[in-house]
Amino acid sequence: ESDNFSTDRPLEFLQYDHHQLAKSDFCKFLGTPRSIFYEKSELDKREIAVQNTTPSELIKFMHEDVLDIITPILARIYTVTTPKQETFEIPAIVQTGAKLYEEVSDLNGIAIPCMYYDEIQRKWNNDNRSVLFDMILERFITIEKPHAYLKEAVEKVSETMTSITDYLYGANVYKAIDEHYYSKLRQIDVEQCTWLSDEDIEKCKLRIHEVISQDCESNKPNAEFCIIHNSEEEKHQAIDQILDDICPDNLRFRFTARVDLETDNYIYELKCTSELSLEHRVQVVIYAWLYKILGYPEKTFRIFNIKTGEMLTLDASIEDLSMIMRTVVKGKYTNTKRLDDDEFLQSQETQETQEM
């Protein structure tokens, strides 16, 4: 009633807990009664920013300090399973209607594998819809306000893709959606998607078949297998825990990662380029790291270059994969301090010790 003397105490109802108040006849208790109260951390009180990303986006423009650390590891964890063979003379640069020149190796690398995927998928079912069409549709429906030009381009894509032109145009549309960049799509219209011949396609499909077919005899392979999507919060919990100490307090990553082909024993990433690059290797490392962290069945990851016949196999511990993944993420989204000579030598000694 008052606070004038040491013996004064609050009125009895002021000492009630949630459950007592809920049972009282003088109080209308709203909400759920609680007995235990936790103090919110500063992180809980701040709004968490979400960064949606993909392995392809992570590996763009890697800092030289990042390359200094990961290059020796990459050299150690990849082995050449099949050395380079005859290099196919597949057009990599084409002239557009505007008399400009565009690099199309990336489009070849999408279109040619999808032709093969459709061929083997149709052996298992009667669905004539192309894998590439589904890839385009899946990406397109996630765009909140697609540009009118992009809508028109998607409407031109063939659902069944019965010609080389259909696949090349579909690859161009897919790339535009994936990279949010429409320059190549504007330069190369559907009528200009004619740079690959039937002979080019047949020899490429034969080369893929010689590598993959034996692992597709018992079970249907999964083309464009999704390891994780940025909407899958539960899957990201394990990732958050591992990357927590290198991320800004209010930033969390949400990954979308799809591998080209999953078979009984292998995960394949297919390329169609003159040379497999360091970026290609890092991309597959990120796929493998996500795959292992999420507890998928053990499988071997491979990179196969359709143009040269070269195949690399990844053989890495989770420690190696995590070192590369953490280094790439840290270099991409946090401020990095350039290593001086002593620090760089120390990092190399640490890696050599781990290898022993």
Which ranges hold each PLM region?
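Generic low-complexity, intrinsically disordered sequence content enriched
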Residues: Q15-H18, L294, E349
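Solvent-exposed amphipathic alpha-helical surface segments
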Residues: V211, D215, L294, G331-N335
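Metal-dependent nuclease catalytic cores that hydrolyze phosphodiester bonds in DNA/RNA
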Residues: E1-R258
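A generic signature of intrinsically disordered, low-complexity regions enriched in glycine/proline
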Residues: R122, E138, G170, Y182, ...
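Nucleic-acid nuclease catalytic cores
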Residues: L243-R326
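Intrinsically disordered, low-complexity terminal regions enriched in charged/polar residues
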Residues: L314-Q346
